Amino acid sequence: MPDTIIVGGGLCGLALAKSLQERGQDFTLYEARERMGGRIFSERCQRNNLAVDLGPTWFWPDTQPRVTRMILSLGLDTFAQHDQGDILRLNTTDEKPEVMELTEVHGGARRVVGGMERLVTAMTAQLPVDRLNLGHTLLSVEEGDDYVILSFRHNERVVQVNARHVVLALPPRLLEEHVLFDPPLNASLREAMRATHTWMADQAKVVVAYDQAFWRESGQSGNAFVTHEQVVLPEIFDACDATGEQAALGAFFPSHRHCAPPFRPPPWPC
């Protein structure tokens, strides 16, 4: 029976596993997906082989010292998010965008060369393979006499494991919605879990690759904000690689579209 079971192979779960490994403490990690990293996910563009982050992209050394130290300790190269140039705003559909007075958007943010998924790969490489279990979806958490019983769905069957300690490195809202607890959690805790927002959970990302960063050549930063009622991509940013040779623009795409009016395109010329 392992001393500690970690449920969730995102950044939080991996960081805890790495810490326990460095201390020589026993642990086993279970992840529902068939990959580690959680919402950290990088994909290669077919157009120019650029590694783009479809999940977390940036870190801020001034305000996130722990993750900064971890990235540096793993020997990962980083670069500053490109913010130099004009920042645009489009308020109406039939006018040209205006130049904003802002001088930067991302406030000293940096990115990992090759995509943020390199952080996940580097962390996972330091952990024993036999302690990492993919494809295990947590179903229930049951309190035993002096241990905890966890039930997972794995390959269309239910697997039970016991541990002295359990760390649930998952969004509280997902735990409350999908995991059965015995004894049940009290009402106030369940309410708090339901009310805990998962940062950026209602946003998706779109990345478009180009042959060259034409916006930089014209003195623009790549940052733009679209605020009119037919907006599809409200915030756009430069997503090029560290050299600027692999060109791309990224954008946030709100997943909740029920509040926005339907898009009605004008007649397009033939």
Label each region the model flagged.
Residues 1-270:
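FAD-dinucleotide binding site
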